Curated annotation (Swiss-Prot):
Mg(2+) 2 binds at D47, D68, D72. Catalyzes the biosynthesis of phosphatidylinositol (PtdIns) as well as PtdIns:inositol exchange reaction. May thus act to reduce an excessive cellular PtdIns content. The exchange activity is due to the reverse reaction of PtdIns synthase and is dependent on CMP, which is tightly bound to the enzyme. One of its GO terms (biological process) is phosphatidylinositol biosynthetic process. Mg(2+) 1 binds at D47, D50, D68. It comes from the Eukaryota. It catalyses: a CDP-1,2-diacyl-sn-glycerol + myo-inositol = a 1,2-diacyl-sn-glycero-3-phospho-(1D-myo-inositol) + CMP + H(+). Its EC number is 2.7.8.11. This is CDP-diacylglycerol--inositol 3-phosphatidyltransferase. Belongs to the CDP-alcohol phosphatidyltransferase class-I family. The keyword Cell membrane applies.
Amino acid sequence: MPEENIFLFVPNLIGYARIVFAIISFYFMPCCPFTASSFYLLSGLLDAFDGHAARALNQGTRFGAMLDMLTDRCATMCLLVNLALLYPRATLLFQLSMSLDVASHWLHLHSSVVRGSESHKMIDLSGNPVLRIYYTSRPALFTLCAGNELFYCLLYLFNFSEGPLVGSVGLFRMGLWVTAPIALLKSVISVIHLITAARNMAALDAADRAKKK
């Protein structure tokens, strides 16, 4: 059998499309909020399809999982950079959010790989119960991730407009009220990610040191 080209698997092609849409979004962010947000959300929406394609076509790969996570982290980080420019008084909060997001996911992924998991989304039964629900319940994972991204996207749009009025309240403002608790919960889960991964790494270090004695 000819060797398979992992880079041309359908889920990975979707991943490349996500990167292209994200870059287009970043290009338009300084001047064209609705164009930028449309491409940003389209990039995020495709995130739901690459996983389905991987399962349906049996094309799940470590490269694809890494590509997916890095695209998510980089896209969110670039949006937060723009938010820091638009809301300079909240710059520290955006910096902390970026740092927490990147650090928690990287350490969690690294600890999963060291422990032998094929993906950072594979949680064993002895793992943290909150993370177990987060990664084994697709509705919970989708709601938290989509709500978090939508919150930041609405915050970006809100700088330019309140949005269409719904009664006496702008749609973007209303959306921020709804998604803000979701974004806050996502940050709490990121803290749990970080603490759990740090404990896992410390336990692995302790086990390695015990073997050497």
